[in-house]
Amino acid sequence: MPTMWVDAEGYGYRAMAQHEYETQWPNGMWTYVVDHHRAKEAFTKAMEELADIAPDHALVLAFGSTSNFRYSVFPQYKSNRVKYRKPAGLSDFYFWIRDNWITQSYEGVEGDDVIGINARADYGDVIASLDKDLKTIPGVHIERGGLIDISVYEADHAFYMQVLSGDASDGYPGAPGVGPKRAADILKNAKTAEEMWAATLEAYEKKHLSREYALQMARCARILRAGEYDLDNERPLLWQPPE
């Protein structure tokens, strides 16, 4: 049976955020509360809706581990998220998901990586995620209640777009002054992964930045794919450029 690989943390976080409320108390205190009962109902409904889109698929929900290899690649990775408050009881909610669904996680990587490592288009697998980063993984994806097919070229192009423009939410900057429009212009004539990497390197060099720095950004942006994780030794294999 083919698998639908689901971003458990993304859907779980959304369900929690949808049912978070401010509460004012008589003594002038304000608190944030999350209605876990409604959040669980919302999450369950979301999983049922995903299952209805591809009813012949088994759902496996991907979680990340507490460690992340990207922290050693680029120490500032996701450091900006420390200041953001998470919905109350999020960890407990994730435990509930683990207790009620089939889940998968690997040491040292994020849930997105677990999906990228396992999702196999040739097996008929489907990817369900709310995160645009998963568009860097080729294969069949759920989007707007339907299915779309992302080719290897499209996935590679999305990856190099991320390498060039960075990701503010993940805390890696990419090439200074290069936003999505400029990144698309840099890559417009590149037809292969090798040409995309060459164009990316040239853009970094024009900013007086080294190949090593560009490689750091690429390894932050890279959602691991099949063959890029050593399952026997439980460690990620750092992305190598196509040169």
Residue spans for each PLM region:
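Domain-level signal for Mg2+-assisted phosphodiester chemistry and nucleotide/NA-binding surfaces
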Residues: 1-95
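Extended two-metal-dependent nuclease catalytic cores across DNA- and RNA-processing enzymes
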Residues: 29-30, 56, 80-242
